């Protein structure tokens, strides 16, 4: 991470130094006046007493025809007019964010400082003239939006494909579960019905058997009769003993 930070700082410093050199060379060589009509326009009047004008100011009128950026041709013809004495400059500051990457790319690709200054001046003129419009190839928004839409469409189609695959998988698996569960449930129901019918038939047959209920009813009656006989015998035996004892006493 530290190495990345150090390299990033190094690149930023090198870019800033290159831009500073290019701006100095531009102020020494280019002395053109530019005016732009934009909705957010701020007019600034700068007065200098000779030498070079301040940064970002020019002193000659630009042609009325729109200037196209000349990035491909490093050597472009320039029309320069130098004046001496008191100079009155009118500058309009324009907020542009499209030409900044083109400037950095142009500065980084070129090798000699002369080519850098020439390309910088040509790009600067296109920046200052607000009526100029970049072609469709150099607009980052027009080039980025189709790719973004294509990527979003691809991702949406992939998501839809995956969702369709999941849905088909679930539909294919649900019949398998039902085909396994339904026979098991039917078999359990049949087994329970058979068990209940067998138990009912056994009970009906056991009730209809003639021997079992009579024997069951006779057993308690015979027991009662045997108990009665035993009680009668004991009572008669005791009465006989009592009579024998009474006779003996007499």
UniProtKB/Swiss-Prot annotation:
Location, primary (coarse class): membrane
Record note on modification: Highly O-glycosylated. Sialic acid-rich glycoprotein.
Example of a GO biological process term: regulation of cell adhesion
Localization (cell): Membrane
Segments of skewed composition (Polar residues): 105-135, 143-153
Sugar attachment sites: 46, 115, 119
Name of the protein this chain belongs to: Endomucin
Species this protein is from: Rattus norvegicus
Lineage of the species this protein comes from: Eukaryota, Metazoa, Chordata, Craniata, Vertebrata
């Amino acid at each position: 991470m530290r190495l990345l930070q150090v390299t990033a700082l190094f690149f930023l410093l090198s870019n800033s130094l290159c831009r500073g050199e290019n701006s100095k060379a531009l102020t020494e060589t280019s002395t053109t006046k530019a005016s732009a009509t934009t909705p957010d326009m701020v007019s600034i009047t700068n007065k200098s007493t000779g030498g070079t004008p301040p940064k970002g100011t020019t002193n000659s009128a630009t042609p009325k025809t729109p200037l196209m950026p000349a990035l491909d041709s490093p050597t472009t013809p320039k029309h320069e007019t130098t004046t001496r004495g008191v100079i009155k400059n009118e500058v309009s500051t324009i907020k542009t964010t499209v030409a900044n990457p083109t400037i950095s790319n142009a500065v980084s690709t070129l090798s000699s400082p002369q080519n850098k200054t020439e390309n910088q001046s040509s790009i600067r003129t296109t920046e200052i003239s607000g009526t100029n419009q970049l072609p469709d190839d150099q607009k980052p928004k027009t080039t980025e939006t189709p790719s973004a839409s294509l990527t979003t469409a691809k991702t949406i189609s992939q998501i839809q494909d995956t969702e369709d695959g999941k849905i088909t998988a679930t539909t294919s698996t649900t019949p398998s579960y039902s085909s396994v569960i339904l026979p098991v449930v039917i078999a359990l129901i049949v087994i329970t019905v058979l068990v209940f019918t067998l138990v009912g038939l056994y009970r009906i047959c056991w009730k209809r058997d003639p021997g079992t209920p009579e024997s069951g009813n006779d057993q308690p009656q015979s027991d009662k009769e045997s108990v009665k006989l035993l009680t009668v015998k004991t009572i008669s035996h005791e009465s006989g003993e009592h009579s024998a004892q009474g006779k003996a006493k007499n």
